[in-house]
Every structure is written in structure tokens, then in C-alpha cells.
Amino acid sequence: MSTNEMNQKKRLNRSGSLSSHLTRSWPWQLTLSYLFFMLILPVIALLSRASDELFKDFWQIAAEPVAISTYVVTLMTALFATLINGFFGVIIAWVLVRYNFPGKRIIDAAIDLPFALPTSVAGLTLATVYSDQGWIGHLFESIGIKVAFTRVGVAVAMIFVSFPFVVRTLQPVLVEIDQELEEAAWSLGASTWRTFWRVIFPPLTPAIVTGVALAFSRAIGEYGSVVIVASNIPFKDLTAPVLIFQRLEQYDYTGATIIGTVILSISLFLLFGINFIQSLNQLYVK
């Protein structure tokens, strides 16, 4: 083969390699661009706006008594809602995957109702059902428990909107678990509970953590249903998202931005912490 032919072949190889690289890279570039403009840029803009007030009013506004009260109410009710959803989410996901019964498809479809229902409609529905004269609210009222327009109502709204995250995260994992492992454990004399904790629960742990984290994050940011089912009185049941909207209505953009930055920081901290725990769990499994 002559020198000219070899050089021409090298140029063709480089051209083909470049073309292949461009073909592979455009989906990656499109993905990065979409994530940057839809997710990263808004967060940067919020943090940038808040940083302008960092040495002026940031800590003063972020640590206002009413703001701290909303952080406590938001986090405590979201934590309570997440614990409830985590417990019942595992049970319901297990029942939907492992058992066949009449109406199963209807129940499975109903799990996604909070995704499809506008949050304002959800809040109106919950306020009606759990009010003192509502179908469920009057039962609690008879034993001295007021649900609507209290922190309990806030927790109920958070439970409603965040529940599907736990169930939908667990279902695919439960489907993949080989039932022969359970049968082997039973044949070796393991009880039902021992089989669950030693055979089923370990592979479910990452999915449970993910589902619970998503539910908690969703509960923290809930506004549409909470603003209707709560009284929104400061130091009683006012949540941080509602306070942010109240500040915007008062044209207090600085206060809304700072409080929003605090909630965003809490969410990011939880997100990174959970990802770190999951990475440690994967290393342990390997």
C-alpha cells in the first residue's frame, strides 16, 4: 500500500471517529442543556438572588420567629406524614404485588390519584371530608380531635399528596424479588417475620429510602392543598411554602427568596445525604 493510500485511510478513520463521536455526544449535550435550563439554572438564580442579601438581611429574615415557626411546622408535619406513608406504603405495595383480589386494578390505579388531581382540588376535598361536619371529621370531633384547620390537617394533606411515591418506588423492586428465596427460607424453618427481615427487607431498603425521601421532599414543598386545609395562622399551622406565598402577596420578594432558599437548602442537604447513604449501602452489598 502506498503512502498516499495510507494517509487517505487515516483521514477516513479520523473522519469516521469524529462523526461517531458527534453522533454519540449530541444526546449527552441535549440532556445537559435540558437539565441546566430546567433544573440547575433556576436554583442558581435563587441562590444568587439570596446571596445579594447575605450580608444585609439574610440571617435576620431567615431567623425571624415566624419563619422559624414555619420551618418547625413544615418539617415536623412532613416527617410525620413520611413515617405514615413509609409504613403503609410498604404494606400496600406488598399486597398489590403479591396478592390477587377483586378490584385490584382499580385500587392500583387509585394510587396515582394524587398525581392527577390538582392540589387545590385535593385541599378542598380534604377540608370538606375532615371538617367538623365532614364524613370523617365529625368522628374525630366526637372524641375531641380537630383535623381540618390544624397541624393534623396539614399532615393529612401531606400524606395524601406524597403517598404514591413510596408505593410506586417499591412495586418494581418487589416484582423482581425471587419468591423461591422465601420458600427456601421457610423450608429451612424460618418464620414469616424472620424471612421478611432477613430475605425480603435488605433488597427493599434502597427502594424504601428512595421512596421515603421523595415523599418527604414532596411534603415539604406542598402548598396547594395545605393552604386550603390549614388555618394558616402564624405559630399554629402556617407552613413555609404558604409563608413564601404570603410574602410574595405583600411584594416582599427579598423575604420570600430568603425563606425559599432555606427550604431549598434543607431539601438539597437531605437529597445529598440520602444519596450518600445509598452509595455506602451499594459498597457494602458489593
Curated annotation (Swiss-Prot):
Top-level taxon of the source organism: Eukaryota
Stored CDD domains: TM_PBP2
Gene Ontology molecular functions: ABC-type sulfate transporter activity
Family: Belongs to the binding-protein-dependent transport system permease family. CysTW subfamily.
Matching InterPro entries: CysT_permease, MetI-like, MetI-like_sf, Sulph_transpt2
GO cellular component: chloroplast membrane; plasma membrane
Keywords from the named record: Chloroplast, Membrane, Plastid, Sulfate transport, Transmembrane, Transmembrane helix, Transport
Function, as annotated: Part of the ABC transporter complex cysAWTP (TC 3.A.1.6.1) involved in sulfate/thiosulfate import. Probably responsible for the translocation of the substrate across the membrane.
Record-given protein name: Probable sulfate transport system permease protein cysT
Pfam family, one: BPD_transp_1
Domain ABC transmembrane type-1: 71-272
Major location (coarse): plastid
Mode of membrane association: Multi-pass membrane protein
Transmembrane segments: 27-47, 77-97, 106-126, 147-167, 196-216, 225-245, 257-277
Biological classification of the source: Eukaryota, Viridiplantae, Streptophyta, Chlorokybophyceae, Chlorokybales
Localization of this protein: Plastid, Chloroplast membrane
